[in-house]
């Protein structure tokens, strides 16, 4: 790769393929490579413009005649838990979250594999091997962390370490927030609502770090896989005019920062 291509991002468009979220539709993506010394700055800028990261690639939907994928970010400092979310936090009071460098482990892959087999056995990631998983975690040129969620043990208060791993989240640290790249959990623990718990934990982490937002990726109205992202209010959704605030009272059309 030349110096020019490292410093000046080149954007590419994928060929149409079946949409994994809305039956009968096709998706296309525009993408670029996140490499070089300014990869972090570029990732910040692109995330603010609706892109997502996957390994060293930043991508955004660019579908013909469809704008259903809407980038959403939770306003961390103003977020208030619902009654149901408070119940989920209480249900997981025995869980401790440990932030680590993005180093893949066999323990993580075991949970990841079980999660895919139970929840996404026919999805695009279903055939990922342990080497594929390692690439997903390690292939990052931006500030990335992996948050491991473990059950507390009698020694956790002393050592700060938990016991069995039951969930994990691959997370980018941006200039204005945390971006949840991918999360997974032990399917045998589904009664804990660990997906919701990890989002709530990231909102709390963003607050402690003084970061205004938690980026959740794409909200898709009418998609059972993605509709849950609309439950975390207040949030902002990216429109053609900029980020639009959504709260319990509805939509506020004035563009946000």
UniProtKB/Swiss-Prot annotation:
GO biological process terms held by the UniProt record: ubiquitin-dependent protein catabolic process via the N-end rule pathway
Enzyme class: transferase
GO CC, alphabetical: cytoplasm
InterPro entries the UniProt entry points to: Acyl_CoA_acyltransferase, Asp_Glu_LeuTrfase, N-end_Aminoacyl_Trfase, N-end_Aminoacyl_Trfase_C, N-end_Aminoacyl_Trfase_N
Record-listed E.C. numbers: 2.3.2.29
Function: Functions in the N-end rule pathway of protein degradation where it conjugates Leu from its aminoacyl-tRNA to the N-termini of proteins containing an N-terminal aspartate or glutamate.
Similarity section: Belongs to the R-transferase family. Bpt subfamily.
Name of the protein in question: Aspartate/glutamate leucyltransferase
Originating organism: Rhodopseudomonas palustris (strain HaA2)
């Amino acid at each position: 790769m030349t110096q020019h291509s490292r410093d000046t991002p080149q954007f590419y468009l994928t060929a149409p393929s079946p949409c994994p979220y809305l039956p009968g539709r096709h998706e296309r993506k525009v993408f670029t490579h996140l490499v070089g010394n300014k990869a972090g700055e570029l990732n910040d800028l692109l995330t603010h413009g609706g892109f997502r990261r996957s390994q060293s690639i930043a991508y955004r939907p660019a579908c013909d005649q469809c704008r259903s994928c809407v980038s959403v970010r939770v306003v961390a400092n103003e977020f208030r838990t619902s009654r149901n979310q408070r119940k989920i936090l209480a249900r997981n009071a025995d869980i401790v979250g440990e932030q680590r460098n993005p180093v893949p482990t066999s323990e993580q892959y075991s949970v990841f594999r079980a999660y895919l087999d139970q929840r996404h056995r026919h999805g695009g990631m279903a055939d990922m091997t342990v080497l594929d998983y390692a690439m997903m975690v390690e292939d990052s040129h931006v500030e990335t962390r992996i948050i491991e969620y473990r059950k507390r043990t009698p020694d956790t208060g002393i050592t700060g370490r938990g016991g069995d791993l039951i969930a994990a989240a691959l997370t980018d640290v941006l200039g204005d927030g945390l971006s949840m790249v991918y999360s997974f959990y032990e399917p045998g623990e589904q009664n804990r609502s660990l997906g919701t718990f990890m989002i709530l934990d990231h909102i709390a982490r963003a607050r402690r770090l003084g970061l205004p937002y938690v980026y959740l990726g794409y909200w898709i109205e009418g998609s059972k896989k993605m509709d849950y992202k609309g439950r975390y209010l207040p949030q902002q959704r990216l429109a053609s005019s900029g980020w639009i605030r959504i709260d319990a009272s509805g939509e506020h059309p004035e563009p946000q920062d």
